[in-house]
């Protein structure tokens, strides 16, 4: 891979993937939302080209891109948190933008399109998540991600380019959004507040953003056409244990309130990735321990 296009590159995975691609000598074209405050956090590097286009303007973006690109990674998505997940008109637009991203990949000469799906495509499941796990999403976000993955695969096949879809579990790391459990807990502890949680009995799989970026890079090089890969660490433990690790790394001895917040009506209680296909197909091997990942965020 020599020339890479990334939409929605300012989150934790996008940042880490940009850094990975640049370290491998790739030229990166990052398509960002116009006037995004997070653009300034992207690395300053001669190999990185920042292009400001809304997801609704991907047709225009091809005018600013070379015609000999290799892979397009599509992370761009609107309405990802809270009640916005059930903003159905916006979620439908996200599906359209995913198809637009496939067309952009084809127009720019890419041989491969890689989309970022979500564990939300599955709904509530007890057991490890694999590509073969039945998907019954229970919110508009998950429904749209599932539809986008399936429809973009058909569109890519029509255009003659490779299609790979990922279903991402819980990724954490530098530049993650402030409202995630990891980042909000760190911020509250640093501010001297007492963070509140559910009982934390959920069994959870966290993957560090740097490991996720390596997985995406390997998929760009070796991923199989038409496959769905579940992206996680393949290891899981109770959420309360992760919370205590964050506390011990940020502010040892600080008070945390477990069991104060009730579980949501559709609370996912078990989240663990089956990464056998990732290991077999591309040699993925996540190495960052959760404790070390938290240290990296704090140092950040």
Regions flagged by a language model, labelled:
Residues 52-93:
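NAD(P)H-binding glycine-rich loop region in Rossmannoid oxidoreductase-like domains
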Residues 74, 78, 99-140:
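Conserved Rossmann-fold NAD(P)-dependent oxidoreductase catalytic core, especially the SDR/UDP-sugar
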Residues 83-84, 163-164, 170, 185-207, ...:
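A conserved pocket-lining segment of Rossmann-fold NAD(P)-dependent short-chain dehydrogenase/reductase
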Residues 136-164, 190:
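Active-site Tyr-X1-5-Lys
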Residues 146, 171-183, 193, 209-210, ...:
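Glycine/proline-rich active-site loop of Rossmann-fold NAD(P)-dependent oxidoreductases
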Residues 174-179, 201-213, 228-248, 288, ...:
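Substrate-binding strand-loop-helix patch
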